[in-house]
Curated annotation (Swiss-Prot):
This is LexA repressor. Represses a number of genes involved in the response to DNA damage (SOS response), including recA and lexA. In the presence of single-stranded DNA, RecA interacts with LexA causing an autocatalytic cleavage which disrupts the DNA-binding part of LexA, leading to derepression of the SOS regulon and eventually DNA repair. It comes from Thermosipho melanesiensis (strain DSM 12029 / CIP 104789 / BI429). Its EC number is 3.4.21.88. Pfam families: LexA_DNA_bind, Peptidase_S24. NCBIfam families: lexA (TIGR00498). One of its GO terms (molecular function) is DNA binding. Belongs to the peptidase S24 family. The record marks A84, G85 as: Cleavage.
């Protein structure tokens, strides 16, 4: 959904509260009276809320405003495990999905999750057993955390491209960076979030 202006948010909040208190929606005149607007001014805000996907309405019925239930979470596939260490073999087939908050992703894209094995990224607050949420992409800015394939193994590291070399830097002071030829690695995803379950 598109972002609301401050005034549109106030109108939406009024509509929500009105429905909760009365069991039916306000009319355009109710909205206009509350905000000291002309009916036309109130109508403009209602149309904006409808266009942005926050409400639906029937123009033939003065009290037909309905709130659109926002999707709070989505399911994305878990494609296997990823090493936060020396690297593990390429994706295993995993018939699993994980639920993540919609706010964790932005815009269009292909998202997937991998389960972390190892502790090379602990200083970035990524620990063994976490699920990392990745946006599928093949190019990534320097300094970002990425899932990369190297020597047929997939690993999670901070990524730096330097001329014809790539440096994969762990977030663990006890571990050393991996330096390799750029042609020998493949970026498969950019880190966008972490999910952790507590037992």
């Amino acid at each position: 959904m598109k972002k609301l202006t401050e005034k549109q948010q106030k109108v939406l909040d009024f509509i929500k509260n009105y429905i909760q208190q009365n069991g039916y929606s306000p009319s355009i005149r109710d909205i206009a009276k509350h905000f000291k607007l002309t009916p036309r001014g109130a109508h403009i805000h209602v149309i904006a809320l409808e266009k942005k996907g926050y409400i639906t309405r029937n123009p033939k019925n003065s009290r037909s405003i309905s709130l659109v239930k926002r999707q709070e979470s989505i399911l994305i596939p878990v494609k296997g495990k990823i090493s936060a260490g020396m690297g593990i073999e390429m994706f295993e087939i995993v018939d699993e999905e994980i639920e993540i908050p919609v706010r964790m992703i932005s815009g269009f894209g292909n998202y997937f999750a991998l389960k972390v094995e190892g502790n090379s990224m602990i200083d970035a607050h990524i620990i063994n057993g976490d699920y990392v949420i990745l946006k599928k992409q093949y190019r990534i800015p320097n300094g970002q955390i990425a899932a990369v394939v190297f020597d047929n193994k997939v690993t999670l590291k901070r990524f730096y491209h330097k001329k014809d070399k790539v440096e994969l830097v762990p977030e663990n002071k006890d571990m050393n960076p991996i330096v390799c030829d750029a042609k020998d690695i493949k970026v498969i995803g950019k880190l966008v979030g972490i999910i952790r379950f507590y037992e």
